[in-house]
């Protein structure tokens, strides 16, 4: 079984190196996910092809997210991280070869092998080495990797794509190699803490956690539209800015970078709030209402809006739609049965990845028949309905530390 956080601070591994490494892993995967979307206007990737890439990644991730907890328990969290870095390297190579062709979906399939396992594997080691009072903040800090990757990609990739679209993919491949080396250096120190805890756990046993825990079921249900709206922000905002708001590629990339910066601020702020001031459950509910409202405002945006207003809306959209993950995962870990954080996280995230599958499909489908504005409004409504399910807190809410 997975023990609680070590009490002996002298013998316990330091939290900071593991936290930085696992955040870097998420940033690397995020760069790989965002790359085709950010460079789409330059390369000429159609929304349908872009949606196929994101959907393929999320479908595969849906099936492999539970395996992340198992693999971390069997081989170690950093061994899984190394595997994910290799997968990102391969994905970018395939994407570079595919260009704007439908073969880009194959790159998405490969990326899903990293996208699914990385979060449960990270949760397993961070839960193991982090004191309970610090978990909301630590998990939120870890989730800032998504924003860090998004900001770097949104700012750097458009300029690289202006020179040659291949340069963006090659840059991410080089980062993957650097990450692989770092993960292998840290692996001997951290992996023995969790190795041997994940074998023999069946998917049905992990899903039984949801069947017997009403609070976990609610979180699983909410993670579907929450994730759908988040990926809609990350994958389609650049295309939305260019095609419907009249922005050029660099401006649209900056808009996404501002949204990612908002997500970074949100994850840090809400992690601190849930650690010290409000219960994590209440914080998640507030974020659900906030992202629903922001999606509606984005749907109303027009080319006549000022640049400052667009930046402000993008920032707030990022604060909410990309700021919920850390507090959410900390609450999942808190509600998990003793020793089963990885499996429980994987079980809940299967619903989240279902949302990541549904999101691009809905966005592409609605955009084809109507517009991206209507698509954002539809996902905002879905998120609002899911948030209403969360209003009633669990019997044992998580008090601020």
Locations of regions flagged by a protein language model:
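Helix-to-loop junctions at the C-terminal end of transmembrane segments
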Residues: 65-76, 266-279
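Conserved MFS/SLC helix-loop-helix module at the cytosolic interface between two early adjacent transmembrane helices
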Residues: 63-99
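Cytoplasmic membrane-interface "Motif A"-like loop-to-helix N-cap segments
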Residues: 74-85, 275-289
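Juxtamembrane intracellular "pre-TM" segments in multi-pass secondary transporters
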Residues: 2-12, 190-220
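Extracytoplasmic gate region of multi-pass secondary transporters
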Residues: 36-37, 215-257, 264
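Cytoplasmic helix-loop-helix junction between adjacent transmembrane helices
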Residues: 107-146
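Helix-loop-helix hairpin linking two adjacent transmembrane segments in secondary transporters
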Residues: 142-188
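C-terminal transmembrane helical hairpin of 12-TM major facilitator-type secondary transporters
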Residues: 281-328
